[in-house]
Amino acid sequence: TGDPKGVVYSHRGAYLNAIGNIMTWAMPHYPVYLWTLPMFHCNGWCFPWTITALAGTHVCLRRVEAGAIFRAIEDHGVTHMCGAPIVMGMLVNAPDDVKPSLQKPVAMMTAGAAPPAAVIGAIEKMGFDIIHVYGLTEVYGPAVVCEWAPEWNDLPEEERARFKARQGVEYAMQEGLSVMDPETMKDVPADGE
């Protein structure tokens, strides 16, 4: 994105985003969180504070590889993790000999790009529960989410996955959100276009 740039975070902003993560994901006390995000990128989407606030366990990897991820899930009882769609694809396309049958669902938050509906469908069949968010470095990571509507539960799998690839409902802790025309700086219609 051009020359290196920096963003200064405030403690208050990081705190608000951490609370937003908890609320958005409806996270319970004592989660077991697997780190596949770099903590230096948007402060790990503020999950160092999110997990710690819930008295959770942080599970760290030396390398983000499918085998290591699946072993950590089994060995530590991972309940939550985050990862870009490329991590989802890595898990879906892992050799069968490293893919365990998950004993319980693993909640996975994804961002960085819109995940392909086929990847969402495939990874959910493996036992992952996907939530899609969008954010920017300037807003501490996640800022908007695909807020799931219960009526989507009965849709065909492909259509459900297509809906899950969307996002756009602001985090509760965000002051506001608007999408503007860059030339006029006026709000664009909220019509999904």
Pin down the residues of each PLM region.
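Conserved AMP-binding/adenylation subdomain of ANL enzymes
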Residues: 15-32, 40-79, 94
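Gly/Ser/Thr-rich phosphate-binding loop
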Residues: 53, 75-83, 92-162, 172-178, ...
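Active-site glycine/GP-rich loop and adjacent strand/helix microenvironment
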Residues: 168, 188-191
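AMP-binding/adenylate-forming core of the ANL superfamily
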Residues: 176, 191-193
